[in-house]
Amino acid sequence: VLTHEMGHAFADYVGEREIKWLSNVTPSMEGAETHSMSMEFLTSPWHRLFFAEDTAKYQLSHAEDALIFLPYGTMVDHFQEIVYSNPDMTPDERNAEWTRLEKIYRPYIDFDSLPFYSRGAGWQRQLHIYLYPFYYIDYCMAQTVALEFFALHLNDPEDAWRRYLDFVKLGGTKTFVGLVKSVGLKTPLEKGSIGPIVEELGKWIEKNNI
């Protein structure tokens, strides 16, 4: 949480000094979340100061959780698209739809012994569905770019940081797609953009498995 929020704080600090117009300091939600999620990974050389002998365990768990989050976050957005397109759905129909999506996005999870989840009510624990409709997909797009920064960091930490700093300095002067392309990265909207990132991270996870 600390490095995540520090990413937001750092972006504000830099933006207020680099960008003339205050209205252009903060980017869209997915851009802002890229600041924070990327900082979680780019601070990895200092993770030992937090976790000491458990640093390797944390870094492995962090990378795995980031990858696992992508199908779940996408499922949340897919569910909202269906629900908002069909406002007359009954509670049972919504639960049935969530169950169907679980089998598509997370078929490896067995909910049979968990009544709340097995009846398809798991979507109710996701606060964003109630309070921040359609915000969750922003996390997915930001996480994808953050993982791209992490993949760069594994091979060339200085280049990864330089691109990240350039990304931050642009603040909200460009769209999310414009920001990502400006620093030479692929956007999550490009076909085939996620595959190479997952492959790179998969190799790292296998190499650092505990």
Language-model features and meaning:
Residues 2, 10, 38, 49, ...:
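C-terminal, non-catalytic "cap/extension" segments appended to globular domains
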Residues 3, 7, 32:
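Single, functionally critical "micro-switch" positions that shape active/binding sites
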Residues 7-21:
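Catalytic Zn2+-binding segment of zinc metalloproteases
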Residues 15, 26-54, 63, 68, ...:
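Post-HExxH zinc-binding segment in Zn-dependent metallohydrolases
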Residues 18-25, 48-59, 156-163:
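Short, glycine/acidic-rich hinge or "gate" loops at secondary-structure transitions
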Residues 21-32, 131, 135:
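Alpha-helix N-cap/helix-initiation motif
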Residues 22-23, 61-66, 126-130:
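Active-site-adjacent structural elements in folded domains
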Residues 29-33, 57, 61, 92-99:
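An alpha-helix initiation/capping motif
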